[in-house]
Swiss-Prot record:
The gene is rplK. Pfam families: Ribosomal_L11 (PF00298), Ribosomal_L11_N (PF03946). SMART domains: RL11 (SM00649). One of its GO terms (biological process) is translation. It comes from Legionella pneumophila subsp. pneumophila (strain Philadelphia 1 / ATCC 33152 / DSM 7513). It comes from the Bacteria. Keywords: Methylation, Ribonucleoprotein, Ribosomal protein, RNA-binding, rRNA-binding. GO terms for cellular component: cytosolic large ribosomal subunit. One or more lysine residues are methylated. Belongs to the universal ribosomal protein uL11 family. This is Large ribosomal subunit protein uL11.
Length: 144
């Protein structure tokens, strides 16, 4: 018989830098999960990723206090800011543009994000990423 799911916990943790301090400790502690065991497993799973990049993770906690987790790809906004070399997006994206990216850069980001996107193909994924870029005040060159 399958284990009974007690909770799903969604967090964004920097790759390779999970530790028992907030937000990880309190979120897992109130569910009775072994915090250090999760931190070691998460850090091992994100070891090959760029250190410090925020990684969304969904932790499934079972009634016997065991857990499993699924790591997702970094948020598109973080990847766009990194590609554009900016600290934050524009406060007024319609009037003030903060950076320019071309289609090839968006394709690279779309390839990274593809597993988590519902887009049918790469072109649709690029359009989705371009929409995120425009909402951040990043100008997209070469997209019709």
């Amino acid at each position: 018989m399958a284990k009974k799911v007690e909770a799903y916990i969604k967090l964004q943790i920097p790759a390779g830098k999970a530790n028992p301090s907030p937000p990880v400790g309190p979120a897992l502690g109130q569910r009775g999960v072994n915090i250090m065991e999760f931190c070691k497993a998460f850090n091992a799973a994100t070891q090959q990723m760029e250190q410090g990049l925020p990684i969304p993770v969904v932790i499934t906690v079972y009634s016997d206090r065991s857990f499993t987790f699924i790591t997702k790809t970094p948020p598109a906004s973080v990847l766009l800011k990194k590609a554009a070399g900016i600290q934050s997006g524009s406060g007024t994206p319609n009037t003030k543009k903060v950076a320019k990216l071309n289609v090839s850069q968006l394709e690279e980001i779309a390839k990274v994000k593809k597993p988590d996107l519902t887009a049918a193909d790469l072109a649709a994924a690029v359009r989705s990423i371009a929409g995120t870029a425009r909402s951040m005040g990043i100008e997209v060159e070469g997209l019709e």
